[in-house]
Amino acid sequence: MKMMLVRRFRVLILMVFLVACALHIALDLLPRLERRGARPSGEPGCSCAQPAAEVAAPGWAQVRGRPGEPPAASSAAGDAGWPNKHTLRILQDFSSDPSSNLSSHSLEKLPPAAEPAERALRGRDPGALRPHDPAHRPLLRDPGPRRSESPPGPGGDASLLARLFEHPLYRVAVPPLTEEDVLFNVNSDTRLSPKAAENPDWPHAGAEGAEFLSPGEAAVDSYPNWLKFHIGINRYELYSRHNPAIEALLHDLSSQRITSVAMKSGGTQLKLIMTFQNYGQALFKPMKQTREQETPPDFFYFSDYERHNAEIAAFHLDRILDFRRVPPVAGRMVNMTKEIRDVTRDKKLWRTFFISPANNICFYGECSYYCSTEHALCGKPDQIEGSLAAFLPDLSLAKRKTWRNPWRRSYHKRKKAEWEVDPDYCEEVKQTPPYDSSHRILDVMDMTIFDFLMGNMDRHHYETFEKFGNETFIIHLDNGRGFGKYSHDELSILVPLQQCCRIRKSTYLRLQLLAKEEYKLSLLMAESLRGDQVAPVLYQPHLEALDRRLRVVLKAVRDCVERNGLHSVVDDDLDTEHRAASAR
């Protein structure tokens, strides 16, 4: 009797197992059957990239065109072959926390179509990297001033931005670049194309039927814009003034189809990693505050919201100041259902979606602050606004070093940092490497001015590219806590400049230029931000605060000059001999 019960129990367990397997198989086949049924021709489906006919079918999510955009333009990307929606790549990474320097956040294996790009950068392809070959040269160099072309920015030749970028202060060339001065040395004969990748479904963002470049044309033109951005990075700048890939990349960030979404690990607030159809990736910060809302006066700087529009505005401000140290950022309206929930494989993220009493789609994810039902992010009804910041090259390809900001705040409710109580703190900093022998202290002054103009108190660390050593620029990452208060100027942000009394001549002259009525900073920012998809990006009082804070910065420099003399305060980086010595 007992043996019969045991046998029946085993049979029951086996049946349950078989039923579970059958259900899993059915659930896996269901999306394919739906897509097959959605085709007019009813031809059999496959697990490869979707053909144009399938992309156009109602069962396959379509790329949204901008309002007023012709249907043909909005569907151009939809007519091209799409990669599998869960495909990820490891050529990039974006970092805002110190621990990000230790490991990559890649989620899946590199897809076959992206392997040639990685081989070209890693040097695993025998023909990709030739350090001693004449063809071994940087792909993207600054073409230099060209009056026949419109400068970067949404304005035309008659725009205020165009006039600014034609000014001599914005036409100073960087020193000649050597192999040691570029982040990636890629063989310019290596092209990314369907033939090179041996994959006919390599996504192309152009119109249907568009052909790839002939072998005689520049190979770099066949690369996706995110890769053009990466290979344009050098010792002196993240991107050159006249790099056309930057405007194209901004457009990609706001229009490329999102194929995969995952939560970014680390950090205090929710951020999403979004992957696009061309294997590019970006960091998505959702909207948490309206434009006119200010940071509550009782909030500490370390518990303030991270604002998506601050990330967008920071990129444009950095470019107007001619620092070019912020990765490209663009605003975008995202469909929370089709572009986040339906494409994510992150179960922790997926489980936090719900429908609010007002019938809006909401989610909250997982993070240290503001990730709960009470602080959920809700769409209208499923559209949410956010910023998308382009990833920097993956840490496995281009290591970055994280530095503690000497003027880091205490991040404590009661304690003060040393620099807040010691007026001679800068003298101690200037005796500490790398601030004792390099131009790093001048980079910190640039960063101080940048943060003061935005009102950003949250600059605890910064990063540099390891390849370039100490003689390189600071990357201005993670600017979401800027533009929080337009009615208050946080003078403590300016303490490094007041203590050290050092500034680059180029920075000082540009600040003076932007204080003039004909090149007013607020007007330049308004024009630059006007081209973003979520414009207006900044509330008008924030733009007016920029002009007010600029006057405060210039007064601080004048006070330093009166105390210490012009030559002790202003470092003449525009002098030819000085710049040649700096390059060495």
From Swiss-Prot:
Effect of C48S: No effect on homodimer formation. Complete disruption of homodimer formation but no effect on secretion
Protein name as annotated: Extracellular serine/threonine protein kinase FAM20C
Cofactor annotation: Mn(2+)
Annotated segments matching region Disordered: 62-81, 94-159
Annotated site residue numbers, Cleavage: Q92, D93
Gene name of the encoded protein: FAM20C
Localisation: Golgi apparatus membrane; Secreted; Endoplasmic reticulum
Biological processes, Gene Ontology terms: biomineral tissue development; dentinogenesis; enamel mineralization; odontoblast differentiation; osteoclast maturation; positive regulation of bone mineralization; positive regulation of osteoblast differentiation; post-translational protein modification
Record topological domains on the Lumenal side: 32-584
Effect of N470A: Impaired secretion
TM region positions: 11-31
Region spans: Kinase domain: 354-565
Organism of origin: Homo sapiens (Human)
Disulfide bonds: C362-C378, C367-C371, C426-C500, C501-C560
InterPro entries attached to this UniProt entry: FAM20, FAM20_C
Record's GO cellular component terms: endoplasmic reticulum lumen; extracellular exosome; extracellular space; Golgi apparatus; Golgi membrane; nucleoplasm
Effect of R89A: Impaired secretion. Loss of ability to promote osteoblast differentiation
Known EC number: 2.7.11.1
Keywords of the record: ATP-binding, Biomineralization, Calcium, Disease variant, Disulfide bond, Endoplasmic reticulum, Glycoprotein, Golgi apparatus, Kinase, Manganese, Membrane, Metal-binding, Nucleotide-binding, Phosphoprotein, Secreted, Serine/threonine-protein kinase, Signal-anchor, Transferase, Transmembrane, Transmembrane helix
Propeptide: 1-92
Activity control, per UniProt: Serine/threonine protein kinase activity is increased upon interaction with FAM20A.
Tissue expression pattern: Widely expressed.
Positions glycosylated per UniProt: N101, N335, N470
Result after altering I90A: No effect on secretion
Effect annotated for changing R408A: Reduced kinase activity
PANTHER family per the UniProt record, alphabetical: DENTIN MATRIX PROTEIN 4 PROTEIN FAM20, EXTRACELLULAR SERINE_THREONINE PROTEIN KINASE FAM20C
Disease the record associates with this protein: Raine syndrome: An autosomal recessive osteosclerotic bone dysplasia with neonatal lethal outcome, although some patients survive into childhood. Clinical features include generalized increase in the density of all bones and a marked increase in the ossification of the skull, craniofacial dysplasia and microcephaly.
